[in-house]
Curated annotation (Swiss-Prot):
GO terms for molecular function: structural constituent of ribosome. PANTHER family: LARGE RIBOSOMAL SUBUNIT PROTEIN BL17M, RIBOSOMAL PROTEIN L17. Coiled coil: none annotated. Gene3D superfamilies: Ribosomal protein L17 (3.90.1030.10). Part of the 50S ribosomal subunit. Contacts protein L32. This is Large ribosomal subunit protein bL17.
Length: 127
């Protein structure tokens, strides 16, 4: 029985799942807004939020821990230079999930994952 087992499988192997969430977290830290399915968005919080908490204290050891989890230098740089200082006084809850309808092909529920307190870009205001 599968009682008390946390985390979703998404019909993927553990390596595929781990790689998918590394890539999604790296994209989130680069662009600060991504669109994905709602279950993936909910599961992404478990990966991304601890990394932002880690980035609050900028040290070589923390950068190495973050790089081990993300494997992306640009994302780690953004995490420690931009996001860590931005959320230094926030005790958690760095991500916001916004439901945005259903995907055309398979009617999967979709959601935007964005970082709270992110600067609004002029292009997005025009939309």
């Amino acid at each position: 029985m599968r009682h008390q087992k946390s985390g979703r499988k998404f019909s993927r192997t553990s390596a595929h799942r781990e790689a998918m969430f590394k890539n999604m977290a790296a994209s989130l830290f680069k662009h600060e807004l991504i669109k994905t399915t709602l279950p993936k968005a909910k599961e992404l919080r478990r990966v991304a939020e601890p990394l932002i908490t880690l980035a609050k204290v900028d040290s070589v050891a923390n950068r190495r821990l973050a790089f081990a989890r993300l494997r992306d230098n640009e994302a780690v740089g953004n995490l420690f230079t931009i996001l860590g200082p931005r959320y230094a006084n926030r005790p958690g809850g760095y991500l916001r999930l916004l439901k945005c309808g259903f995907r055309a092909g398979d009617n999967a529920p979709m959601a935007y994952v964005e970082l709270v307190d992110r600067p609004v870009v002029a292009e997005e205001v025009a939309e």
